[in-house]
């Protein structure tokens, strides 16, 4: 992968996430972005909530820019936590689960963002995409 997320890699991540969404029976919106948060691949499954399109891409963008999962960022952005209020910066960040960085040799090369199910379902589908890339190395 050479510390860069190719279209082929992004499709591999997307396909694994789509398979997981089918397995759990929840139509999803799934976005894969590069390390700058720019869209590489996207899919909206039949029946996925239309309002979740922006949320999926926002989760992926947030995770890539901040270099951590949106779930972890959410914990750090809770009231009284060190990053409280960060979600209003950078054009708006998403601070609940479903966005996870994609790494190559420890370097963040992009991220996946998933939305349309429960937060737990979104995280599970995103993790399937991450695992597919990790298994490719």
Cite the ranges covered by each PLM segment:
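Flexible, solvent-exposed loop/hinge segments and secondary-structure transition points
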Residues: 1-137
């Amino acid at each position: 992968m050479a510390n860069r997320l190719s279209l082929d890699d992004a499709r591999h991540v997307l396909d694994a996430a789509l398979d997981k969404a089918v397995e759990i029976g929840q139509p999803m919106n799934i976005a894969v972005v590069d390390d700058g948060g720019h869209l590489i691949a996207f899919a909206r499954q039949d029946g996925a909530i239309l309002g979740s399109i922006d949320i999926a891409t926002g989760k992926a963008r947030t995770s890539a820019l901040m270099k951590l999962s949106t779930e972890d960022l959410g914990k750090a952005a809770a009231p009284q936590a060190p990053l409280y209020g960060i979600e209003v910066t950078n054009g708006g960040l998403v601070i609940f689960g479903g966005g996870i960085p994609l790494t190559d040799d420890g370097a963040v090369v992009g991220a996946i963002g998933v939305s349309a199910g429960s937060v737990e379902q979104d995280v599970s589908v995103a993790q399937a995409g991450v695992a597919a890339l990790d298994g490719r190395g």
